[in-house]
């Protein structure tokens, strides 16, 4: 009897300790508080959720002065183990001073656990509410615009690398535009994307959900985030200016990588066209030169023949053939001497230059 009697106090003590441990463990679970902007109503919807609570338990909302805030909706359920799951929401249409507290009170254990949040005044502005209600729409438009710019950039890159028709059009555009104007196009393209990426960060920090767990250092955290944002913006702007300056310097000295490949392709294409044109022009030039020389020789021969026919020879000569031969020799020598003179040579060179210029105009 003594051993059994001595075990009873220990058994009851263990049961009490287990019960207290379970109850304290249940009440020590975290309370989750979420906020969202409803699409239909104006205001901020605050939701408090707690799970695995030992029944019976109550959930109440209080402001900074301790006044009870009536909930907009409540929900409770039990799991297989008999533990409660509570969920309560309130709709705040006006800004509040100080924290808002969600408390859970257990009547059996006479324990209460609280969780407080601070809502920023920005959440109650109409501009913020309209923006946050369509936050996914604005984010989708932003991403679509970025993808569209990158898609256009890829199309232009493929066209400049493969299609000859696009190169011909680019050659015409380059003849109209100056070198500085051509350099500004890729710079503006890259600068636009950089500006969009830079502008997204402050917009996110300005219109994000500013809900802080009650903490003495939440103001310091907020200021620290804004300082980090300003530092990042300053660094991005500085590096953007440096990159644009380097691109402008490279383009000024004709060493810009983005335009060098295009210039090389265009120069090779122009060289091929010029070589084919020069070959055709050389062939036409040789043929026309031979024709001019033949016609010039024929005119000289005709002039000699006419001069020989007009020549009055002596009938006492042995034969007319000898007279014609001597006449031709004399006229040929005279003509050769006349070509040796400066005036005749100058006229012949002028005549030749004039014929070549006419030939060049005909070939073009």
Swiss-Prot record:
It is a multi-pass membrane protein. Expressed in skin and thymus. Its main location: membrane. Encoded by one of the 11 copies of Skint genes clustered in the D1 region of the chromosome 4. PANTHER family: BUTYROPHILIN, SELECTION AND UPKEEP OF INTRAEPITHELIAL T-CELLS PROTEIN 10-RELATED. Disulfide bonds join 48-102. The chain crosses the membrane at residues 139-159, 187-207, 231-251. Belongs to the SKINT family. Residues 1-28 form the signal peptide. The keyword Cell membrane does not apply. GO terms for cellular component: membrane. Residues 29-118 form the Ig-like V-type domain. It comes from Mus musculus. Residues 29-138, 208-230 are extracellular. It is found in: Membrane. Residues 160-186, 252-364 are cytoplasmic. Keywords: Disulfide bond, Immunoglobulin domain, Membrane, Signal, Transmembrane, Transmembrane helix. InterPro entries: BTN3A2-like_Ig-C, Ig-like_dom, Ig-like_dom_sf, Ig-like_fold, IgSF_BTN/MOG. Gene3D superfamilies: Immunoglobulins. This is Selection and upkeep of intraepithelial T-cells protein 11. May act by engaging a cell surface molecule on immature T-cells in the embryonic thymus. The keyword Cell inner membrane does not apply.
């Amino acid at each position: 009897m003594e051993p059994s009697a001595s075990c009873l106090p220990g058994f009851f003590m263990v049961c009490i300790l287990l019960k207290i441990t379970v109850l304290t463990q249940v009440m020590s679970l975290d309370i989750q508080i979420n906020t969202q902007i409803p699409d239909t109503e104006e205001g901020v919807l605050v939701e408090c959720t707690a799970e695995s609570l030992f029944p019976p338990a109550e959930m109440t909302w209080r402001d900074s002065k301790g006044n009870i805030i009536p909930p907009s909706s409540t929900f409770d359920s039990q799991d297989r183990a008999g533990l409660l799951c509570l969920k309560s929401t309130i709709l705040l249409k006006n800004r509040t001073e100080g924290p808002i507290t969600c408390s859970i009170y257990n009547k059996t254990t006479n324990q209460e656990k609280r969780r407080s949040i601070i809502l920023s005044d920005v959440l109650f502005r109409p501009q913020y509410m309209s923006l946050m209600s369509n936050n996914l729409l604005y984010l989708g438009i932003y991403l679509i615009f970025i993808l569209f710019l990158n898609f256009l950039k890829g199309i232009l890159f493929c066209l400049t690398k493969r299609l000859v028709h696009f190169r011909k059009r680019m050659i015409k555009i380059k003849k109209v535009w100056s070198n500085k104007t051509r350099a500004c196009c890729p710079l503006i393209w890259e600068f636009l994307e950089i500006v969009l990426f830079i502008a997204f960060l402050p917009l996110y920090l300005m219109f994000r959900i500013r809900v802080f767990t009650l903490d003495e250092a939440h103001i310091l955290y907020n200021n620290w985030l804004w300082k980090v944002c300003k530092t990042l913006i300053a660094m991005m702007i500085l590096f953007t200016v440096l990159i644009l300056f380097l691109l402008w310097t490279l383009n000024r000295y004709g060493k810009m990588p983005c335009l060098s490949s295009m210039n090389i392709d265009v120069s090779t294409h122009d060289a091929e066209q010029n070589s084919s044109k020069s070959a055709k022009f050389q062939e036409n030039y040789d043929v026309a030169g031979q024709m001019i020389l033949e016609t010039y020789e024929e005119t000289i021969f005709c002039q000699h023949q006419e001069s020989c026919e007009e020549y009055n020879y002596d009938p006492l000569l042995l034969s007319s053939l000898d007279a014609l031969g001597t006449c031709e020799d004399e006229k040929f020598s005279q003509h050769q001497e006349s070509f040796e003179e400066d005036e005749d040579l100058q006229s012949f060179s002028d005549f030749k230059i004039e014929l070549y210029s006419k030939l060049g105009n005909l070939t073009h």
